[in-house]
Amino acid sequence: GSPVTQEEYNKIVETQLTELWSNYGKLFEIWFDGGVLSQQNGGADILTLIQRLQPNSIAFQGPYGYPNLIRWVGNEEGNSPYPCWATADATTSADGVQKIKGLYGNPHGNYWCPGEADFTLRRNDSFQGGWFWRANEDHLIFSTDELLLKYETSVGRNTNMLLGLVIDKNGLVPDADVK
């Protein structure tokens, strides 16, 4: 195909987000993996859309100016830094580009932007780091004790815990993962 302009791309993004944010009820969290290119820098008008269509959702690495932001803590192991402050400055909450100095938040930060510790139920040596299902990998599921430790190093350190589950070829969470 032929390349699209940034303007055409923005229209595609805005159309798709309008569909997703309009047809499936209230969303709890909207995930922007890698952050959001601001409108001032040529990106789509995400802020206006989210404020109009999903104003109560939490936005992971969402657009600058949105009041319900959460931020990445620097790894996908469920291991938040300590201490981990729920306030941050603009460099840790605005553009999705996490500066290492900002992983702890900022106790004097001007923005309420708590951390989120994401990790998968399956170990990182499984297919695609545990974010996607593949047969014969049930042995890579974390034990209850390991999950409790991840809870302590995420929620116990003042961050939201996001547990990534796989969906199998039938569109379901596998029985082994549910147990």
What annotation goes with each model-predicted range?
Residues 1-179:
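Mature catalytic domains of secreted/periplasmic carbohydrate-active enzymes
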